[in-house]
Amino acid sequence: MEHLRPQLQNNGGATASQRVSRSSWNGIPTLSLVSYLAGSVLFLYLSLFVVDVGTIYQNGDQLIYLENAVKMLEGQTMYSDFFQFTTPGTEFVYLCLFKLLGVHLWIPSLVLILLGSVAMGLSLVIATRLMSGADVFLPGLLFLTCGYFWYLDGTHHWFSSLCVMAVLAILIENRSPARLLAAGGLCGLALCFTQFRGLMALVGLLVFLFWEHRDKRQTVAVLLKKLACSVGAFLFVVLGFNGYFAWKAGFENFWWCTVTFGLKYYTGWPGNTWRMLALNFPRLHQWSHELPRVALYLFNIGIAPLVYAVFFYYSPRIRRSCPGELVDRLMLLGFVGASLFVGIAPAVGELRAISIYLPALVLMVWLFRSWGKAGRRTLYALWITALLLAIVEPASRQTHWRAQLILPTGRMAVLDPLTYDMHRWILERTKPSELFFEEEVPRLYFTLDLRNPTPVPFLTTTEYTRPEQVGGVIKALAAHQVRLVMTSPFLNLPPYGRDWGDHLAPLRAYVATHYQWVKTFPNGEQVWERQEAER
């Protein structure tokens, strides 16, 4: 840190002359800005679509939210007709898009392009308030290539994280009442996608306001006004948005799904605990191919806590060496970002870590700029890595083995033979809107335009799946005489070789009694057809 003082003084953002330049924005040449944003869109497009083939199939939790939105489009009520543990923001976004554009396979991919592009833009807004030069592009580029690319899964994580990034972009300039109202509302909006993230964003903001009050020796009246703006706007959005869904589903149903379930049963699945670190760890079949992925995994998991630990350790020296306005901006990122990490710490997984680490990436680049030649060399290495990944990652998608399927929801590019075989086999034996049930992972409902008649999106052999939910599945299969059911061999085995609360025995008995086996896929999943006598 021997070069801390002179470097920090050069990290304060764009100069006044740069800001007034007609050919630049915050000191960034217009051509560079356009290239950055257009390049981000192109990167995401080539990662989500195969040219002249179709939308790349993305397996992930987004398929649950898409299925739920289709159910809502057809008149079902979330939390009463079917289960969901997150607040309704994600389904609401997809529902609005389906009403406006129709149910199409490309819609979630379009959403992912928009989410990624806006995140890149917000990171740039924040970075330009802390530093100048080409390094302002690096946090967003690292986020895109090291993190976002690996989890192109349009779930609540990305929506809520974008809201929090917008909070930082709004407040980093100043904390006027109008800006605090907007920030509090955005924290509330984040909660409408991910309960704990919105709450922790507000906690981080409030901690910063208390710190600022003490550091600037503001009056209590000023502090109370700021708190009232933030908390008031937060509550207004949370109660206003969620209140409608609670009223429609019934407050008891809404509370059980979004609060009680999370407190009592969410951690019943090992993947929602610290064990997620082991579950996410890349499988090392071929070391030469997997080592880069392992390096990315370790970076994605570890960078946020490491950056915040280093930042707060050096914060006294930073406060002595930097202008007051810059210190305020850095502390805002530090408090809110660290609060977000605390929110995911009990169940750190790679997706959760990536979804909250963009503020940490901005701080990381700023810190490296402050550490003289060693920091500059590290930044060069990060630039080279990010630029290489920006070329290799979309190129790998475009040159990968692929097959095309013409589905009821659109043209789909499939990048693995198993997924292709599953879709083709089921497609040939079903028709759009037909009832169908997948036990473990809902991979086929949205793409094949099939309907899950049960109240749950998937089942587990843990306390995460409640006995009454299993009963609801059996009741729905019987009431609707569902013809095809797909079972998973993994639901016959306890996770990690121990009993986590398996309640599926009645369902196994029901399927064995009323269905007959017709197909086994290479991964062991089976399709069962209702016996002829019962149709």
Residue ranges and their predicted role:
Residues M165-A182, R214-Q218, E290, Y297-V327, ...:
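Membrane-interface transmembrane helices that cradle and orient dolichyl/undecaprenyl
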